[in-house]
């Protein structure tokens, strides 16, 4: 890895960020979109979620109206989708994916009034409280909403390389992977029975989930010699307030 980075004129950390976030990650999205463009979309609804969204036979969320105008008229609707994913383990249909990608730039706090801001915060709480929270948080991260809207401090840990002898992933992916493991204690019956029972013995799991989500947030602003845990602890109160806690 180091030799490849050096041959291309980068240090390892710079190379990884350039390669993964500006090449590999976008390639994944474009490849997915090309694949879906070649498929016939399942538009037959089997269940209504709201007056604007429904579910098809593949458990995908589909628009019940023109997706082009659906989000352009009310971008807040995007956040409800991730709440449904977390609560019911639904999937995103291709029209929904493209519509989110086309309108994600409208997802900026300065464009949202106070009443809508409260609804957006409620949607995040529904994501955290949902049974499939890690899946939904990954999607929020993939579309850029986790860092660009909910937790701006998350930008600083995106692609941030860590000690390769302990961590296999950059910091943001490491956090999401940790959330996957935590979520597995809730939905996977084959996980360690002791840990599973310990997890289910916790009455309110919100604090635990948020702790895992934010446990490395201090790494993004750390300078040499600084304690990342203390830095993160100072950031957390303001982050939680922004999230509506």
Region spans (language model):
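Active-site-adjacent "gating/activation" loops or surface patches in catalytic cores
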Residues: 51-61, 142-159, 170-212, 217-218, ...
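Alpha-solenoid helical-repeat scaffolds
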Residues: 72-75, 172, 226
